[in-house]
Amino acid sequence: MSFATINRSATKALSASIPAIEDAFAAEPSLKKRVYDAIESTPQHVPLFEDIAKYTSSLLARHANPPTQPVEADEGPAAKKRKLQNGNVAGDTQSSGDVKAEAPLQFYMQDVSFAIPQRKKLTLEVTAGRGYLRARNQTSKEVEFGVPMDRIRHVLCLPVPEKSQRQFNFCIIPQYSDGINPPPEGEQVFESMVWTVSDGPAKAAFSGNGQQVGTGDGETAEALVRRVLNENLSHTKVVRPDERQFVSAMPEAHRKAEKAYHVKAFRGSKEGYLFFLSTGIFFGFKKPLIFFAFENIESVSYTSVLQRTFNLNIAVRPHNGDENETQEFELSMIDQADYAGIDAYIKKHGLQDASLAEARRAKRYNINGAKAEEDAAGTASDNAAEESELQKAQRELEDQEDEDEEDYDPGSDGESDGSGSSSEEGEDGDEEGDEDDEGQDLVAAELGSEAEDVAEDEL
């Protein structure tokens, strides 16, 4: 009897020290007492009550209405106001104040290297109850930026190119931050996020109650973060490169035994990397990130196809855009070695055919799970296979004519063909043009000699 009394007292003292329950039911003392009474009767249910308390706190924080700074209509460019105030607009259901409000955590990882929107080491946090993904300053302890989980539209986990040690970039693309779809007037926009984790176990990852996780179980930091995100995302799942979609013809520059999933490209003068994924085409890792979701792509075509490089043109239409509202992105100086792989990817998903754009929008690849990826790839492959042999032959003939027109310039006098962004590309174009000129001269000479022979025989 005395042992039972001591055990019950210890349990009661332990339960009274649970911070999550104290915070969640501070305004409801009678309900808090009932929770502690239940824990005293069934101490094995302490984790359950703690989770319920954390979820309750997250709901209270989410529905709180902290004061917001008013936004003047003529204060300045919309993009600048969004950067300064994190898109805080009167009347929004979510605000930056909500993101920064105190809330119980489900997971956090210290010393995470962020590249976007700030380049510094911060603490990555996931609040309980599918609340927010955010980054906290490790010195001031203030939340620097964040995004509600239900506003995230795409999450990518991509190997960092050209590194001697394996690393992974997590790219968070919220709604209206993909570089394609502009927000409606007055709509709040959250910034994209990019952070890096190394290959190997997590060194400073913790659950919400402060218990270290990711050590001793063989789970890498990349797998741990990916699992936590998948458990909390509501509209999507983490997407990774898949060699069934695309793999580069060239291996990793510093790890020759590993396959590379990226292609180097330029958008204007800005260098970046293209990733061809199961849900769309990504260009990063510098601001602004661009994600070409399948449902936004009107068509994909090639330009300036030279001996060593070519350009990729992607025509897109926003979700809320009309039929004629399209925008074209040119990604240049792509290595010819990856032409076959990229072309196979484009045809697999029917991206070269603008007539399939409506079908892609109707399909809306909105769930990125493994089964959805395979089904989507199979559907797009079937659509691409419907192209008739006549259409295929006509398209190939037109492509060949376009290449001949680009490569042959009888009045060039050594001027560079194509985009002109690289001297090497210009030299390649000249060399190829010289080869074509030489080939045409040989054909003309051969035909001329045959005509002379016929004339002599007739005489």
From Swiss-Prot:
UniProt keyword terms in alphabetical order: Chaperone, Chromosome, DNA-binding, Nucleus, Transcription, Transcription regulation
Chief location: nucleus
Pfam families: Rttp106-like_middle (PF08512)
Chain segments carrying region Disordered: 64-96, 370-459
Skewed-composition ranges (Acidic residues): 398-416, 424-440, 449-459
GO cellular component: chromosome; nucleus
Biased composition (Polar residues): 85-96
InterPro entries per the UniProt record, alphabetical: PH-like_dom_sf, RTT106/SPT16-like_middle_dom, RTT106/SSRP1_HistChap/FACT
Quaternary structure and interacting proteins, as annotated: Interacts with histones H3 and H4.
Family stated for the protein in its record: Belongs to the RTT106 family.
Full protein name: Histone chaperone rtt106
Organism name: Neosartorya fischeri (strain ATCC 1020 / DSM 3700 / CBS 544.65 / FGSC A1164 / JCM 1740 / NRRL 181 / WB 181)
Gene label: rtt106
